[in-house]
Amino acid sequence: MGNSSSTPPPSALKNSDLFKTMLRTQYSGSVKTRRINQDIKKQYPLWPDQGTCATKHWEQAVLIPLDSVSEETAKVLNFLRVKIQARKGETARQMTAHTIKKLIVGTIDKNKQQTEILQKTDESDEEMDTTNTMLFIARNKRERIAQQQQADLAAQQQVLLLQREQQREQREKDIKKRDEKKKKLLPDTTQKVEQTDIGEASSSDASAQKPISTDNNPDLKVDGVLTRSQHTTVPSNITIKKDGTSVQYQHPIRNYPTGEGNLTAQVRNPFRPLELQQLRKDCPALPEGIPQLAEWLTQTMAIYNCDEADVEQLARVIFPTPVRQIAGVINGHAAANTAAKIQNYVTACRQHYPAVCDWGTIQAFTYKPPQTAHEYVKHAEIIFKNNSGLEWQHATVPFINMVVQGLPPKVTRSLMSGNPDWSTKTIPQIIPLMQHYLNLQSRQDAKIKQTPLVLQLAMPAQTMNGNKGYVGSYPTNEPYYSFQQQQRPAPRAPPGNVPSNTCFFCKQPGHWKADCPNKTRNLRNMGNMGRGGRMGGPPYRSQPYPAFIQPPQNHQNQYNGRMDRSQLQASAQEWLPGTYPA
């Protein structure tokens, strides 16, 4: 920078020596000019990539605010500012000395001097205009790029909204198909409704419409969750099951370029305020959503590729202060990993909020084959703890009642009848009993499936305890069998093994013969017929049977009460068949 032929003043040499001494002290004799050039170029876009010695660029560079650059760049700019001021002062002194010399010798050309001054002024004005024009062009270019990025982001958000709407319609169609399938099934306990996963029916559509984030969308929202995708290298995919469907997310790998070839370094990228606000809305409501809190936190940590510091940052937004204080008291919470911190916060929520009772969920819990007794009890324990609101050390009896009632009906009846003291047993004692009766039921079902149909009809019905059940008789080949069957006092049961919940009287499922409403209605209509069966009889043995009375004439059947005079006159008139009395 400046004229190398002129000798710099002592002040400039002193500043130069001080700056060189500072560089040797701070940087051990080496200065990272590449990093300084990059730092200046961010604030001054017209700065060349390899640096420059042009005065016009340095005069603009020293105007950069020092608080917007790094420390070493600020030191360099301070030094250059001093150098430029010293150079301007030296130039002014040289011009003054030259003018005085011209005045002494009397060879000053005033017109030539004025022409040179005007020429220098025009050159400086032209240089300033060029700089302002380039700054204006660069600013307009940045504004156009920002507008284009906003337009692209809005278009991609519209596409994602359309994809989510299509997925929601597909889920509604799958639920409707499942309900129609349930309605077509007969009301029989031997049939089991196959619970179909909604995600399997729409796996092809989900794979074609999976929400994937891109690097051009830092605020991309995927199924209610914001993703971060700045400065990513190779994306990593993760599949999360949400609302019965499999959703594939794309989270960034936190590897940032170091500027030295292809080498990268992991840098922590904390949550942004917009992401924290959206995650607070998506978090399950407390305390009702405590059972789903652990799963939601685990999915969020996997989607955002979070570490322990991110968990603490998210906890300050979604959890109140008492919950965070309780979690901090837990031993080892400060140095715990991500999974341990999530479990600590769930435990703190259970301790802070009152227990939520949902006995409907507990009563609806049932055994699902092919579970073992241990797996069934383990799953039941989770459901009971999340919905009972009782302390575990005082909930043994209701828990055992829950697991026994949730077994298949035949297994439940066999366990209760074979073990009258089942309600007083402990959990380790009841698990082997349940496994024993489940094995008996499975062997009996397998034996029935392997036996041919003809042998099943010929075999007597067997219960799980070995007692013979009722088997209906077969229709005979006697002549006029249908006429003889009409004269039987009570209908016979159908052949074969009748399901245990079918009535032998009305042949309708849902109750037994002793509780049949049709049987009670028929007996109520018969009235006090006595001991004589359907034809009636005396209520006691000492009373004789009443004489049968012949029915009256047809036109008098309607008169069952007291007959007045008009009715007597009408009945006394003579009339012929086919006519009616006047």
Swiss-Prot record:
Q: Single GO cellular component annotation?
A: host cell plasma membrane
Where is the segment annotated Disordered?
168-222
Which superkingdom, per the lineage? Viruses
Q: SUPFAM superfamilies under this entry? A: Retrovirus zinc finger-like domains (SSF57756)
* UniProt name for this protein: Gag polyprotein
Give one GO term, molecular function aspect: nucleic acid binding
Say what the protein does. Capsid protein p25 forms the spherical core of the virion that encapsulates the genomic RNA-nucleocapsid complex.
Marked site (Cleavage) residue numbers: M95, T96, H251, P252, L457, A458
InterPro entries named among the record's database cross-references: Znf_CCHC, Znf_CCHC_sf
